[in-house]
Amino acid sequence: MKNILLIGTGRFGRHIAVQLSQLGHQVMAVDTNEERINDVLPYVTNAQIGDSTNAEFLRSLGIGNFDVCIVTISGNFQNSLETTSLLKELGAKCVVSRAERDVQAKFLLRNGADQVVYPEKQMAKWAAIRFTADHIFDYIEIDEQHAIFEVEVPAGWIGKSVGELNIRRKYGINILGIKHSGKTDVSITPDTMLSGEITILALGEYKALQKCFRI
């Protein structure tokens, strides 16, 4: 369990609060908008209405006590940048900030952010891949070069074992697991047989995955 400071409780921030709550973490939420704070109250440990660009207000929260500070302010990049910078100045251990464009990410990283997330960009990429390939069922981006795809078993692989196909050597791809009837099995061995009734979870470089599965 970690102690999380969440600044900004718009739609993206609220979704993060819900997920963190489900994972059992302690979350303090901060926003200037009382209505948004009230909306997120069921999912957080504590909440404060306040201006995150005010150094004294942030200092009163005890920034150094949080394991991670997440800045999800939208619609006002200046406030997001100032908040990110102040958090680091006040001793934040890890600052994760939201960006909408690459230029914003560069400024955030130069001014205190340890990591940057692009919710809109990442969702757009997911949708573009997921809904233009009938054999792709899910997609998780690891970084700019690597991803995990849930994909149907290629026709030429059906009835063969993982070891027989030698997927890692041929394609540089790792089979992490298989899914059948909504259940995931990650106990993959060279003897694991592939059928048309399952989907596979494959990890690798984008180029290798695209070539292998014709994405």
Kindly give the residue locations of the regions a language model identified.
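Cytosolic regulatory regions of ion transport systems
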Residues: M1-I215
